[in-house]
Amino acid sequence: MPEPKHALPAGLTRRQALKLLGAAGLVAAGAAAGCKSPVPGADMAPSVFVAKAADYTVDLGASLRRGLAELGLGPTEIAGKRVLLKPNLVEPHAGAGHINTHPLVIQAAAEAFAALGAASVTVAEGAGHRRDSWLVLEESGLGEVLAAEGLPFCDLNTGPVHVVQNLGGVSRLGDLWLPDALARADFVVSVAKMKIHHWAGVTLSMKNLFGVMPGSIYGWPKNVLHFAGIEPSILDIAATVRPNLAIVDGIVGMDGDGPIMGDPVAAGVLVMGRSCLAVDATCCRIMGIDPAAVAYLRQADGRLGTIEAARIRQRGEDPAAVRRDFALLDYVPAHRGLRLAP
């Protein structure tokens, strides 16, 4: 883990320093709350970039910068923008790097956006299983990285919220409550982990958006969303939030009984694109999974974008060349029939 670049203020714990950074970042953002208008229409010919990364010691920043360039993202689009990075922080398991988005991926993403002239970069998450997002932040190792880089963290489970129209209309959730911090961002990035999921089949950049739903409204572990149906809720949230970019950490992913109890699997890739749906479909193919067999991806096809390989402009590595079949469990209904043909 990198050494902190800034000493902590005298008398402050790391958690207190992170909270102060978070408050300062949110004050600096300053814009009035209100949901961004969704991107009109679905991109039916999106680009997805795949980079090899053998482990977390390689130059992740170079891979992400190349990916951004391949996707046409440069200073013209990012300069002066408030960027929000939304990692996958599930459980405070120290040393279990296959559970949460790796801290060094977040660090590399923050540096890449700063280099493009972003006005600010904030890391924000509403941990799903634990009420204390700060505990998950610290034990995941991300807190140390944020403190070292002077990056603010925002707990999306608490704080002011506002109601927006549910633009998906698939579940019975009705209107959605979202954090004001999400609305203040100009550019939202879902920085997910590549994992098998016990109930949904896979959890990638779209399922990662459960973490933007405030626990103060939707409970723990976001039980309201579960009661409304995991897959319909994924579709509604993805259609409403519409992240500007998805990055999936597949350097070490999780197979088997994910998203918490599974085993680490070294897939050795970073996957990124402007369409969460196309990114997730590409990730599935890398995992040896047919995206059309994942119910919520199939339902999103044609509504939020495309899952068809022929329509996705692949950049970087060929997904077939980096395929690493993730283990599926025969006794889990959501895993049956997912395997992609050779």
Q: Where are the model-predicted features located?
A:
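N-terminal and secondary-structure boundary signal
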Residues: 2-342
